[in-house]
């Protein structure tokens, strides 16, 4: 009886909230509204949202549970909001799971826009670009070459490449963040991030974000998420303590040293509050969540596409041999020299266009009344950029669903993609991610030819339907044939 009464009360409150919201917006010229909730059942939501533009245009509203949101489906509207009117759209909604995962939105990716948020972002960006500038690129290259040596030992055997890429990117983040690439630490943080993301993506958590009052009811998934967060925070705090006990003022060994010392000297320009150690804690969390699985997923998509397009792989290897020397050369190439490898750059751009890791960018919130595409957008409205939809817009891209890296080699023929977002909320680790994609694919294609196991068993190019907010390739395996070895001899050796 009590439960029934509580449900009735919560339903009435939700209905009253909805009616009040509609009354406040009655005089505004709002984007058209998609009726019903069937869009929530679509297996590929970004593509479905793009299809709605044929009737509704590139900007419209829909309901995600009790929350009404505005969806942007074109490069033009996304750039209008996120670049030209970036202050209006720089906020972040206070979603229940976001607050839980980010220590009440104390991190950069999920934190709301404020002067304190700007100071936090500035400190972390400085650590990425200044604190490790001298060591970032050489270490990415060294860790990648060590990865290739491990793969050479397994040459001939089918390899689950997604996991290998995930461990590689985690080792890079571990070294840049903690100055430590020991296997035990890398595997511990890798497993921690995997567990956290799997739990966070579960439907039992996603439903709480759409219907927040359900958090008052028993939810085993919510308990598991809290346990994963507690484990994550314990591991990060242990590393912060180790750094505080051993660091030397005015010197930094890694990003954590830089940020801990930066907290002591950086002040917010005006207003209450200042950066605390908790902000460094959440910067570390951001680096692991945003810098491991995302880059590993893009690398996995690149391998999958190259298995489907061996002619592109052959041209890439010819380009590498021509510019850097034949086979598994160790010739030094820096990221500044990337203009020498236009096809490699175009291939990376095409993978990012077709398979942006987060196809629906994290939701934004308007900080004040604004407009997009001639429509009124009230203050506090949640806005979701459909990045994948913008990348598949037939009015912008010729044959948008085709994997065709050469489109980026045609002068002035194609605009840049928005895989890392844009404006104030652009991905903080974009420069590191692009460096990793460039170095890893370069070294991998220098050392190996990618082959499916067995012949003809190609990976699916349809996203994993159980991957949550990230766009992941379905599990697959690949054989890595060392270059410079005759195919027949290699096949005989690998069969023994």
From Swiss-Prot:
EC supergroup of this enzyme: oxidoreductase
PROSITE patterns: CYTOCHROME_P450
EC numbers: 1.14.14.16
Membrane association type: Peripheral membrane protein
Binding site for 17alpha-hydroxyprogesterone: 232
Record-listed heme b binding positions: 109, 364, 425, 427
Disulfide topology: none
Chain's gene name: CYP21
GO molecular function (one): heme binding
Keywords on record: Endoplasmic reticulum, Heme, Iron, Lipid metabolism, Lipid-binding, Membrane, Metal-binding, Microsome, Monooxygenase, Oxidoreductase, Steroid-binding, Steroidogenesis
Alphabetical list of InterPro entries matching this protein: Cyt_P450, Cyt_P450_CS, Cyt_P450_E_grp-I, Cyt_P450_sf
Record function comment: A cytochrome P450 monooxygenase that plays a major role in adrenal steroidogenesis. Mechanistically, uses molecular oxygen inserting one oxygen atom into a substrate, and reducing the second into a water molecule, with two electrons provided by NADPH via cytochrome P450 reductase (CPR; NADPH-ferrihemoprotein reductase).
Top-rank taxon: Eukaryota
PANTHER family: STEROID 17-ALPHA-HYDROXYLASE/17,20 LYASE, STEROID 21-HYDROXYLASE ISOFORM X1
Compartment list: Endoplasmic reticulum membrane; Microsome membrane
BP GO annotations: glucocorticoid biosynthetic process; steroid biosynthetic process; steroid metabolic process
UniProt similarity note: Belongs to the cytochrome P450 family.
UniProt KW Translocase keyword: no
Substrates-to-products reaction catalysed: progesterone + reduced [NADPH--hemoprotein reductase] + O2 = 21-hydroxyprogesterone + oxidized [NADPH--hemoprotein reductase] + H2O + H(+); 17alpha-hydroxyprogesterone + reduced [NADPH--hemoprotein reductase] + O2 = 11-deoxycortisol + oxidized [NADPH--hemoprotein reductase] + H2O + H(+)
Organism placement in taxonomy: Eukaryota, Metazoa, Chordata, Craniata, Vertebrata
Residues binding progesterone: 232
Keyword presence, Endoplasmic reticulum: yes
Species of provenance: Bos taurus
One GO cellular component term noted in the UniProt record for this chain: endoplasmic reticulum membrane
Cofactor(s) required, per the database record: heme b
UniProt free text on domains: The leucine-rich hydrophobic amino acid N-terminal region probably helps to anchor the protein to the microsomal membrane.
Protein's name in the database: Steroid 21-hydroxylase
């Amino acid at each position: 009886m009590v439960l029934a009464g509580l449900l009735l009360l919560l339903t009435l409150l939700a209905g009253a909230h909805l009616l009040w919201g509609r009354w406040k917006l009655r005089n505004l010229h709002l984007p058209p509204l998609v009726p019903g909730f069937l869009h929530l059942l679509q297996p590929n939501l970004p593509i479905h949202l793009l299809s709605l533009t044929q009737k509704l245009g590139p900007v419209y509203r829909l309901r995600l549970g009790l929350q009404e949101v505005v969806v942007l489906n074109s490069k033009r509207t996304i750039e209008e909001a996120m670049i030209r009117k970036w202050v209006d759209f720089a906020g972040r909604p206070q979603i229940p799971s976001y607050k839980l995962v980010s220590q009440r939105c104390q991190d950069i990716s999920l934190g709301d826009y404020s002067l304190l948020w700007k100071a936090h972002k500035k400190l972390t960006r400085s650590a990425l670009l200044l604190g490790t500038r001298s060591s970032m690129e050489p270490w990415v290259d060294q860790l990648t070459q060590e990865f290739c040596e491990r793969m050479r030992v397994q040459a001939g055997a089918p390899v689950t490449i997604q996991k290998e890429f995930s461990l590689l990117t985690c080792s890079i983040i571990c070294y840049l963040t903690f100055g430590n690439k020991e296997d035990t630490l890398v595997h511990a943080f890798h497993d921690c991030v995997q567990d956290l993301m799997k739990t966070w993506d579960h439907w039992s958590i996603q439903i709480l974000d759409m219907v927040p009052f359900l958090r008052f009811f028993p939810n085993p998934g919510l308990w598991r998420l809290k346990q994963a967060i507690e484990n994550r925070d314990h591991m990060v705090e242990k590393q912060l303590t180790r750094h505080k006990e051993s660091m030397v003022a005015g010197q930094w060994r890694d990003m954590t040293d830089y940020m801990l010392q930066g907290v002591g000297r950086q002040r917010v320009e005006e207003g209450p509050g200042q950066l605390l150690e908790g902000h460094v804690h959440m910067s570390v969390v951001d680096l692991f969540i945003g810098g491991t699985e995302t880059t590993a997923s893009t690398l996995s998509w690149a391998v999958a596409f190259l298995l489907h397009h061996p002619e592109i792989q052959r041209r890439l290897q010819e380009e590498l041999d021509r510019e850097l020397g034949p086979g598994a050369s160790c010739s030094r190439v820096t990221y500044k020299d990337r203009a020498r490898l236009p096809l490699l750059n175009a291939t990376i751009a095409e993978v990012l266009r077709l398979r942006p890791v987060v196809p629906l960018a994290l939701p934004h919130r308007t900080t004040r009344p604004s407009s997009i595409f001639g429509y009124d957008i009230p203050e506090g409205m949640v806005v979701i950029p459909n990045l994948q939809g913008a990348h598949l817009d037939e009015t912008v891209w010729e044959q948008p669903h085709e994997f065709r890296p050469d489109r980026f080699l045609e002068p002035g023929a194609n605009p840049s993609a928005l895989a890392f977002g844009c404006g104030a909320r652009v991905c903080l680790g974009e420069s590191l991610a692009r460096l990793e994609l460039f170095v890893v694919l370069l070294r991998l294609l220098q050392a190996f030819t990618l082959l499916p196991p067995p012949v003809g068993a190609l990976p699916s190019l349809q996203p994993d339907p159980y991957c949550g907010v990230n766009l992941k390739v379905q599990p697959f395996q690949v054989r890595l044939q060392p270059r410079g070895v005759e195919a027949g001899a290699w096949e005989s050796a690998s069969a023994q």
